[in-house]
Amino acid sequence: MLAPDYLDHAPDRLVLLWQQVEDDILRDVARRISKMDTMTPTAHWQLWRYQQVEAVRQDVVKKLARCTGKSEAEIRRLMQEAATRAMEAEDEIYYHYGKEPTPFADNATLQALLNAGYQQTAGTFHNLTATTANTVSGQFEAALDRAHLKVNSGAFDYKSAVKSAVDSLADTMKYVTYPTGHTDTLEVAARRAVLTGVNQTGAKLQVARADEMGVEFFETTAHGGARPSHAEWQGRQFHRGGAVDYMGKHYPDFEAATGYGTGAGLCGWNCRHTFFAIFPELGAPPA
């Protein structure tokens, strides 16, 4: 079980790394736009424009390549830390009830799930950043065209047009394009990918441990500011494998009620909720 506060801050180191990449990319783009000052409105415009767009694309690819190794190492470190923390918290519950779960480090099933979670999260990261070069170069190209059009119209001088283009990119620059067409900054995309990967992997480990220990009931965590669809089921108790009435209490079906296993549900996209094992017949879990 991972606390919401832990999940909220888990991606911080990785996000900082990609914030630095964002800053480097924006500085490079601004520098290239400023070179418009040395040109006449029509002198070799198309050739220069093409060369600059290609240069931006290549520079972005190089910057991302330098960052990828650091990112993969941080993802692996974070996944190991989060998985260990989740299992320690979950196993405390089992020990409280006199049960003996196998050590996490010695459990081949759990270790395989952890490795699969790392591979999936790293793969998601690669997919997100794979579009960055084209996304950035496309925005750079559009900014050049807008600035060039302003100058040619006679309404702006080069200095004003360049400043406007740079300021606009600084305020609205996007780096990642999803298949749906939605765009994000690298910071937002990285945080979402890591948070989702860490929480989903921890959840799969907890489900596997529950299978091992014969657990039938789960309770979800709760935190302030939950999205309305999640507030409906946070802090409640559920039964795995269908709704039941047990010891005078109704327990809704875990997956059906929480949407666990779907992107929009428990432990889905950007979700900071998780769950833990309970044994209604044995009393409340440890605080």
Regions found by a protein language model. Give the residues of each.
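N-terminal leader/targeting and assembly helices and adjacent pre-domain segments
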Residues: M1-D171, V176-T177, E281-A287
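Extended non-catalytic scaffold regions that mediate assembly and binding
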Residues: Y178-H182
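Acidic, glycine-rich two-metal-ion catalytic cores of nucleic acid-processing enzymes
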Residues: D184-A284
